[in-house]
Amino acid sequence: MDFIEAKEEYAAAQRRAQKEYKELLAANKDPNPAVLDELLDDNSARVVQDIGLLEIPAERIVGTRAAGRVSTFSASFLPLAKPSSEFAVKWMNLCQAHMGEVGIRDPITCYEYLGNFYVEEGNKRVSVLRYYGAPCIAGMVKRILPARSDEPRIKAYYEFLEFYKSSKLYTVQFRRPGDYAKLLGLLGKELGDPWSEDERRTFSAYFHYFLDAFHGLDVFDKDILPEEALLMWLKIHSYKELGSMTATQLRKSLTELWPDVVTSTKQAEFVEAGPVTENKPGIINWIMNSIPDRVHVAFVHQLDAATSPWVLGHEEGRRHLEETFGYQVVCRSYFNANSDDAAALLIEQAIDEGAQIIFTTAPKLNRITLKFAVKYPKLHFFNCSVDLPYSSVRAYYGRIFEAKFITGAIAGAMAQNDRIGYVGSNPIVGVPASNNAFALGALMTNPRAQIELRWSCCEGTPQADFFRDGIRVISNRDVPSQNKMYMEFCNYGTYQMDDRGGLIPLASPVWVWGKFYQIVVESALAGTLKDDKINLRAVNYWLGMDSGVIDVSLSDRLPIGVRMMAELLRKSMRERTLDPFRRKLTTQDGIVISDGSRRLSPDELLRMDWLCHNVSGSIPSFDEILPMSRSIVRELGIYKDQIPAIKETNA
């Protein structure tokens, strides 16, 4: 390359720089490279590690160490200086060197901070190499470690450092804790597993292939990271598919998933009522005949009704639909979706048989539900879970803590020695809120009440332990059905034990799934069942006693005064004039969570990870949980981001 050609290349690079500069200015974004000195707090002590020579991903070089000549570059290090400037001449000389036999061989020197690189020496080398599309740039690197904190980005960075020890990859930089563990699991690896050189090269190639598709989207959103999009993509596609798809297929698959990619980076929306039914459909809908007079509904269950009370409760909901709507609804149930392959076959069968609304009734089915929801965007998919970040699949669950508060009040009134046993299910979202609501209910009727907490997901025999310790009032698993047989003849709900271990039922929270299913079908028949993908909303229906989805079953053996109190509490809860958590809340450690002047948000209630001051016991760690309970804790656990990744068998 001669100097005239180098001058032409500079002019082309400058035009690109000016275009980028104007676009960033118009978007109210910094048009120049970032400056590390401006990002760091001058007063904080910093640890600097000498990393040595690295091949740095070019897109990770985002700024300079000091302000210096930062104004001579656009944000991606393209040159802005006049062609007649000394800077431009040096850039052209480097351009000639790069295109010559020798090339640019000297490494740059830079600092790494939070996964990005800031050049101290070699800005023009970076500019030339990035202009020519070099994927990596050699550099001598020093790492600046931020002070540890609970800030999500800092926690995610320290997780990256553990990821880097094995992978030696800088290509992915997550900003949410737990995402590295998720990625490793989706790749079929665990934290600490060694990466071969072949695996590194393959992942880097696949990621850059995905990056091209990501940046080629018409709906590209710079607030979403490509690695976050990849994480969502891998939830419904295997890692092997990433290497086998054509560029067109990959871009199409990412476009179809895009609404869910967007919502996965946002806070999920909790709706404390069912789908809207009161809005009347417009005249156009009537003219176009789009309002159905009959709806086909499918229920896909992980187990079967003969062995699972949970499935039996949902089947009662199906029968409620048939009794309520008659000809207007066609319901079919599909059982034993106990693996992804089995679930896929059953959902496909349901669709082939005409299903328009599909309910998958177990949290573990959420990913396979998402896969089909993306594949069939005109159908409506619901998963019985909570806190799902998808716009294609709506989650639905119940505010069971409301009923737990009432059974806690009953237990407090009935506990003669002030001690009450409580058997928790699993440490998943919403369960600590139920534990605490029960404890607060007990305090309302007995200010001396002490709750002894045990867990059914851990080793041990809680009921036998309580009996041996002299505890005679116990709260156990919730009644899954409106059939009172469960409460009267089994160890469900809250009950007393006599001195021989006999059970006397008192009350239990009850799931009434038919109420929710009725709301959905009414909305569909009215033509008002909305498509949340249009508004990029991740909707989670979280319904309480006011909706009828949650209720309390009261035993005929309750003393009349206690029953009257429970009826009054139930009425207040249904009218939403009673909030169990609108009071002073103090943890076991004496920390005041709230002074009672406000309502806790749905997010605070679902992610509650503390126990009330009158609870003895603790929330179990993942290692303490029995293997049979670990899958649900991985899916919905309150500490799921801290759980080691599990290898995906189809990665």
Kindly give the residue locations of the regions a language model identified.
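Short, charged/polar connector segments at secondary-structure boundaries
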Residues: 1-120, 131, 176-188, 215, ...
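A short, basic-hydrophobic beta/loop patch
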Residues: 103-118, 123-156
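Extracytoplasmic "Venus flytrap"
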Residues: 296-316, 321, 332-340, 430-432
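Periplasmic-binding protein-like
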Residues: 354-363, 382-384, 471-480, 503-511
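Flexible loop/hinge segments that line or gate small-molecule binding clefts
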Residues: 374-397
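Hydrophobic alpha-helical segments within soluble ligand-binding/sensing domains
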Residues: 396-418, 510-531
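An alpha-beta-alpha
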Residues: 406-446, 537-557
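Segments of small-molecule ligand-sensing domains
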Residues: 527-650
